[in-house]
């Protein structure tokens, strides 16, 4: 409503109020007076609201008029300042000649005032950025990159010299991310040694827009982050949703189930889709790194004596085109090499060096098996290389161990005859090529001392495994007895471990029985052949 309509409405309300007051003075019934008094109160409240609206409309119109007149006034002020500067510049030499060094020209204060103005502008920019919500990167101690919602608390210079800001993470998942309660007040005594977060300096180029948590995708069975009593956000899974309240079960066995509201739950930071995308990127692009498995090492990888050595193919050096994204490996690291190359004038797609004749593709990094020392890796590579060469030079075996020249069968003795009769096979079946069921036992009869020693060693190792498994079963049963009626989750896991240990014990006992049977057969044959 404009100013005129508000004024007319205000006059109407005041006239109605006067009529109501006259009616109250006429001496009506008590019921009618109650209605009139209520109407009187409503009219007074309405008049106050209308007056407030009228004042705000008049204020806005005055501000608009001032804005229209401000450019002209600003030009007049600038012109006046220009005239003062000219007069000071003309009068300053004369004053200096007349009075020596009595006065200092105001022009000398120009740089100081300019510096002061620049500091004021920087202070204003810092005040504007302070409190802004952004999405900032966080590198965990094991090297993964995650983006967390954070709040800017100040501006600082980054490590590489670029413009940066100090941020505090809003949803801390670790104690090192939890903001220190005394930092913002300036009362923290530990400073850099504080176990809580005093903020992290992040480059402005790495910041992303703030992302509001989308709770619409959360349902029963979904993975999430839930806030615990310690103020940290832990990984959990939703078990029930009821009128905005979420029942979550934390992944950690040390934390119990909890019921939280919408402000205490978040979608996971890394969804399954993003993880699969990152995995596919890491496996699909072979120009960054190549993983060497512990079981299969080709001849080209035998030259990799340590993880820092690079395996470079001739096609990577000679090729003039780059098949990988520029600086794509820096997505998974803290590297700034791409930015340094760009500042030094490198153009994407060209080779390194002064005349752009260097390599185009990045160097392949060879990743050796985890948990192995360099000596073990070198020994494994050399062994597999020697085995591969020996396998290629070794001629194929054309004859069996017991074959005779000319194709004549081996001489048969009385024990072969007895074995054939006891096993129910026809004579000559061995010469026909069909392997008998007791061939392994027969080989054990004629085995050497080294084979029998190996059999005894296998039997001893199996007995040790049985004893170890029995000790594990006893310890699991004791743990079950301690946790009876306490933790259902821990009891269920212990039951699974107990069932697995009992299955393993049964397999080991069967293996022990088979080895004992073979050993008895070998001993029986030895006794029968001694006359």
From Swiss-Prot:
Residues 333-379 form the G-patch domain. Ubiquitinated in case of infection by HIV-1, leading to its degradation. Ubiquitination is mediated by the CUL4A-RBX1-DDB1-DCAF1/VPRBP complex that is hijacked by HIV-1 via interaction between HIV-1 Vpr and DCAF1/VPRBP. Induction: Down-regulated in breast carcinomas. Keywords: Acetylation, DNA-binding, Metal-binding, Nucleus, Phosphoprotein, Repressor, Transcription, Transcription regulation, Ubl conjugation, Zinc, Zinc-finger. Residues 118-129 have a biased composition (Acidic residues). Transcription repressor that specifically binds the 5'-GGAG[GA]A[GA]A-3' consensus sequence. Represses transcription by recruiting the chromatin multiprotein complex NuRD to target promoters. Negatively regulates expression of EGFR, a gene involved in cell proliferation, survival and migration. Its ability to repress genes of the EGFR pathway suggest it may act as a tumor suppressor. Able to suppress breast carcinogenesis. One of its GO terms (molecular function) is DNA-binding transcription repressor activity, RNA polymerase II-specific. Residues 518-531 have a biased composition (Basic and acidic residues). Interacts with CHD4/Mi-2; the interaction is direct. Signal peptide: none annotated. A zinc finger (C3H1-type) spans 175-201. The keyword Nucleus applies. GO terms for cellular component: chromatin; nucleoplasm; nucleus; plasma membrane. The modification Phosphoserine is found at residue 373. It holds the Pfam family zf-CCCH_4. Residues 91-133, 267-289, 385-409, 426-446, 509-531 are annotated as: Disordered. This is Zinc finger CCCH-type with G patch domain-containing protein. The modification N-acetylmethionine is found at residue 1. Residues 107-117, 426-438 have a biased composition (Low complexity). Widely expressed.
